[in-house]
């Protein structure tokens, strides 16, 4: 229900969110915050809780209980690298130059492996993954 791609310079994401019985909505999954870029995938409500927890300082003892179910991922991209938060308050640092997440990640990973940009990778995923689409947002770090 999401595809988010990072190519080392640009973060891109589709805009489709599916609620209830399959109604599609258009949303923004990525944003700039201070000196980093944030992206959420998975359950929208849980992802937003993770994002807001991070923006308030990522206090370990204040980690959202709903996130412990591992239904969403928060991606944080900064000049120091890339990290993800999922079911706990400690990030997983990712050393790879390229990264993608969400249901369209395999298509995006393959596209970037073949030299496509993050935006182009999201475009490819939106063609082949039926729950990705509704446009693309992108932010350059």
Language model feature labels by segment:
Residues 1-141:
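N-terminal nucleophile
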């Amino acid at each position: 229900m999401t595809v988010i791609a990072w190519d080392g310079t640009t973060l891109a994401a589709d805009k489709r969110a599916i609620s209830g019985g399959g109604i599609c909505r258009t949303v923004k999954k990525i944003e700039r915050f201070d000196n980093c870029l944030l992206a959420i995938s998975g359950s929208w409500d849980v992802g937003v809780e993770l994002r807001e927890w991070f923006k308030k300082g990522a206090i370990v003892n204040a980690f959202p209980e709903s996130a412990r179910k591992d239904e969403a991922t928060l991606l944080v991209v900064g000049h120091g690298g890339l990290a993800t938060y999922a079911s706990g308050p400690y990030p997983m640092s990712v050393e790879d130059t390229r990264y993608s997440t969400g249901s369209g990640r395999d298509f995006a990973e393959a596209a970037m492996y073949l030299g496509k940009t993050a935006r182009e990778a999201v475009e490819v995923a939106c063609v082949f993954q039926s729950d990705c689409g509704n446009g693309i947002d992108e932010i350059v770090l």
